């Protein structure tokens, strides 16, 4: 009886030690993320307080700065102006609700107070945004994000915006046409790298919807190609999120309106992002 009891205890201790080792190993793999800062840029799928971005930040105990705005798209409009309001002024249409303005808001947080952000000097400003555009980071600021994740593209597809030619990815970012998807991605990734070179930039593709779209997969492929050419991790949420057109067309299981994720859908997205970040930072060890 004593031998059996000894075996049970020993087996239990082995199990406990194994679990502890696995837990410590998992934490070690991503120790460079824990307690750090993460920035989310995107549209209405990312903007909610309990979105995949919040779920991801909570998992790693990271501080989240969410700059996403409902309705945003990658590509500029013909009349887009520099507009750093948290909710860009629409002037009747969504001309300023674009990723470039979210990136400018990010740059203001990372650039020292009073320093001019020269790229904006070439552009027109909305009357509500003072020119020149300058940094807002004070000497006491601790803002120093480890990761910026940009999740966008579904509104570009719905609005019929041009993907453009892949050659836009090879241009100096100042010459990239932000009215095309490729040009907008090149500009955003490149300018963030210029001002925050130690920050990892991750791209997310759109997820599937309940309604069929022939164009959306083309935008997904373009974002993946952009990630590859710009040496920027890109996560294929369209294929990996577990949210599918086939299921959502019959029942709103993960998308409450056929487009926007409910709590379960956001959880699925968060889990995919977490997995990829673990893989990304494990490979860096």
Q: Residue ranges of each PLM-predicted region?
A:
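Second-shell loop/turn segments in exported
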Residues: 41, 45-46, 171-178, 210-213, ...
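Bacterial lipoprotein signal-peptidase II cleavage site
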Residues: 22-28
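Bacterial N-terminal signal peptides that target proteins for export
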Residues: 1-9
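Conserved SGNH/GDSL esterase-like catalytic core that processes O-acyl groups on lipids
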Residues: 34-40, 45-166, 170
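Extracytoplasmic/secreted proteins, especially bacterial periplasmic and envelope-associated proteins
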Residues: 40, 51, 55, 59, ...
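Active-site segments of SGNH/GDSL-like serine hydrolases
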Residues: 149-161, 186-221
């Amino acid at each position: 009886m004593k031998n059996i009891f000894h075996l049970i205890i020993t087996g239990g201790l082995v199990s406990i030690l194994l679990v502890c080792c696995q837990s410590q190993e998992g934490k070690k793999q991503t120790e460079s993320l824990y307690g750090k800062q993460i920035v989310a840029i995107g549209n209405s799928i990312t903007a909610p307080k309990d979105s995949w971005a919040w779920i991801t930040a909570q998992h790693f105990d990271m501080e989240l700065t969410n700059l996403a705005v409902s309705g945003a798209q990658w590509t500029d409009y013909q009349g887009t102006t520099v507009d750093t309001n948290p909710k860009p002024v629409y002037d009747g249409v969504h001309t300023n609700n674009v990723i470039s303005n979210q990136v400018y808001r990010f740059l203001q947080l990372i650039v020292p107070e009073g320093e001019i952000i020269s790229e904006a000097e070439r552009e027109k400003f909305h009357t509500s945004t003072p020119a020149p555009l300058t940094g807002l980071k004070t000497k006491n600021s601790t803002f120093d994000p480890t990761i910026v994740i940009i999740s966008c593209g579904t509104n570009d597809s719905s609005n019929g915006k041009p993907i453009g030619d892949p050659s836009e990815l090879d241009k100096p970012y100042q010459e990239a046409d932000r009215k095309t998807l490729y040009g907008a991605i090149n500009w955003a990734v490149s300018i963030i790298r210029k001002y925050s070179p130690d920050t990892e930039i991750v791209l997310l593709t759109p997820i599937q919807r309940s309604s069929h779209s022939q164009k959306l997969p083309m935008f997904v492929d373009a974002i993946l190609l952009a990630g590859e050419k710009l040496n920027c991790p890109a996560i294929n949420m369209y294929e990996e999120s577990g949210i599918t057109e086939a299921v959502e067309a019959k029942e709103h299981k993960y998308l409450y309106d056929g487009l926007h994720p409910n709590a379960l859908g956001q959880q699925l997205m968060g889990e995919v992002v977490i997995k990829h970040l673990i893989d990304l930072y494990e490979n860096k060890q």
